[in-house]
């Protein structure tokens, strides 16, 4: 089996058009920067993996990639779990959560990509095999305060072939009317997801706000209600889960299986949204 020869990081930036005011709970996002990790083996073949949040943590990612590169150079490319343990063991004092785990995730993905190329197998065959022939995907946007703008954007997604649309909440007191207007426009042509975006916001709502919202949204039969409270607020999730019949989704910023274990044991999620490179 070939060995790791080099690990590099590349950044690809897309500046948003000036007329696009992309606000979210963390503030204004002016561009999208993707961090791609490239692992090259001793045969000159390579695999790619992605690190999320590169637009916020550009410089730290560069240093972390260099740190882990020094540990992994010379390792056989098939020793993916061993690579994870080496990286975690070298950083456990300061890296139980956060962007360093995300960089480890990107390296993990790149190793799988490279191994799949060497074995001429898709990665899903390397991690247990095919589960479903088809899966539904959704268009994710919906940061709008007016029904007109929301429906216009959702129609664009519909014309592109999407049949599920995710909208995000800007103000909790406007969301029910937006959902009502969306359902009036699309009826059964398009399903809807509502993201409260409370998992990462600096000043989350009180639990009762999300509980009341969930109760109001039940009659609109949305697919799921995403991140109705801060991700570390497991007691809040328990309270919300008990109060509604809606499917509750979250966990996209819970970085490891160890960190997710208490959520799994508490059964607070109907839909788990792991992001393995966060």
Regions found by a protein language model. Give the residues of each.
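Metal- or metallocofactor-binding catalytic centers and their adjacent structured scaffolds
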Residues: 40-118
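Active-site flanking residues adjacent to catalytic metal/cofactor-binding acidic residues
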Residues: 49, 194, 226, 251, ...
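Conserved, mostly hydrophobic/aromatic
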Residues: 4, 37, 44, 68, ...
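Metal-dependent enolase-superfamily TIM-barrel catalytic cores that perform enediolate-based chemistry
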Residues: 128-244
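Active-site phosphate/pyrophosphate- and oxyanion-stabilizing loops and adjacent acidic/basic residues
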Residues: 113, 125, 180, 238, ...
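Glycine-rich, aromatic-flanked loop segments that form ligand/cofactor-binding clefts
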Residues: 99, 108-144
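Structured beta-strand/loop patches that form or line metal/cofactor-binding pockets in enzymes
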Residues: 1-48, 52-53
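Catalytic alpha/beta core domains of metabolic enzymes, predominantly
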Residues: 231-278
């Amino acid at each position: 089996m070939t060995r790791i020869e080099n690990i590099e990081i590349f950044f690809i930036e897309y500046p948003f058009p000036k007329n696009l005011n992309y606000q979210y709970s963390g503030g204004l996002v002016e561009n999208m920067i993707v961090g791609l990790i490239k692992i090259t083996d001793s045969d000159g073949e390579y695999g790619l993996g992605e690190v999320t949040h590169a637009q916020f943590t550009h410089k730290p990612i560069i240093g972390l990639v260099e740190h882990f590169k020094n540990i992994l150079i010379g390792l056989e490319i098939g020793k993916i779990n061993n690579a994870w343990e080496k990286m975690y063991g070298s950083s456990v004092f300061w890296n139980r959560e956060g962007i360093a785990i995300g960089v480890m995730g990107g390296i993990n993905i790149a190793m799988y990509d490279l191994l799949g190329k060497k074995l001429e197998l898709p990665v899903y065959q390397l991690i247990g095999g095919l589960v479903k022939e088809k899966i539904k995907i959704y268009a994710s946007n919906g940061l709008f305060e007016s029904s007109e703008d929301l429906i216009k954007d959702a129609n664009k997604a519909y014309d592109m072939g999407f049949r599920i649309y995710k909208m995000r909440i800007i103000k909790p007191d406007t969301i029910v009317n937006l959902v009502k207007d969306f359902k009036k426009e699309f009826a059964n042509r398009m399903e809807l997801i509502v993201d409260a975006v409370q998992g990462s916001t600096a000043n989350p709502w009180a639990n009762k706000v999300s509980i009341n919202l969930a109760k109001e949204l039940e009659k609109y039969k949305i697919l799921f209600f995403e991140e109705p409270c801060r991700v570390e607020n497991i007691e809040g999730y328990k309270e919300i889960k008990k109060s509604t019949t809606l499917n509750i989704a979250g966990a996209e910023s819970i970085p490891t299986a160890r960190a997710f274990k208490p959520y799994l044991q508490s059964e607070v999620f109907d839909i788990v949204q792991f992001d393995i490179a966060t």
